[in-house]
């Protein structure tokens, strides 16, 4: 399970298994590195993609399901494939959120609520029977190209004043943004693996990904 006092780097794979097979074995094993099966990756490769990730990485695997309904089945699918954490959208019905959190607890998985598109994350949390392990403050991929869109760190103190949860910062994270996230109280920074032609910010898959991972870990210490 994730620990409150540790700062984590989450590296997101959003493309295909070819990229996973090429890059993942080069990343140094570290308890502070989480490997994410991104939503586009899961849609493309299915549960088998998560399973292959788990075979290549003996650390924590995050299944970015972004569940909106059918919570129990999706959590069980991710767990059976080897994931140790999974995400649900904060905009999902409260019944779905509660079922998701309960099933994650039963399976000893870390539950993550992704607040993508949610204006007031605290209001979502106040409706729940129990809080998640992680709250994700997320600037979406499509928002990255809109000038002035930012990760809303202003919510961190509000959330942490009421709940003992970890905060994850996602969306357009580079070394500078990672430093800002930690300064503002985040516990996890999510960095996308991107191609040179993408409009998004992250670690370019053509770079020395292992070295970039080390730089991020040093930055968020």
Feature names for model-found ranges:
Residues 7-13, 33-37, 61-65, 86-88, ...:
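Hydrophobic faces of well-ordered beta-strands that scaffold small-molecule active sites
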Residues 15-19, 39-44, 68-70, 93-95, ...:
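Short, small-residue-enriched loops and turns at beta-alpha junctions
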Residues 1-63, 67-72, 204-216:
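Conserved N-terminal beta1-alpha1 strand-loop-helix module at the mouth
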Residues 2-5, 73, 77-164:
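Conserved anion-binding
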Residues 43-65, 100-117, 151-171, 206-221:
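Alpha-helix-loop-beta-strand connector modules within alpha/beta enzyme cores
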Residues 154-189, 194-200:
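A C-terminal functional module that forms or caps the active site or interfaces directly
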Residues 83-95, 136-146, 184-212:
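Glycine-rich phosphate-binding active-site loops on the catalytic face of alpha/beta enzymes
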Residues 30, 56, 81, 130, ...:
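Structural motif
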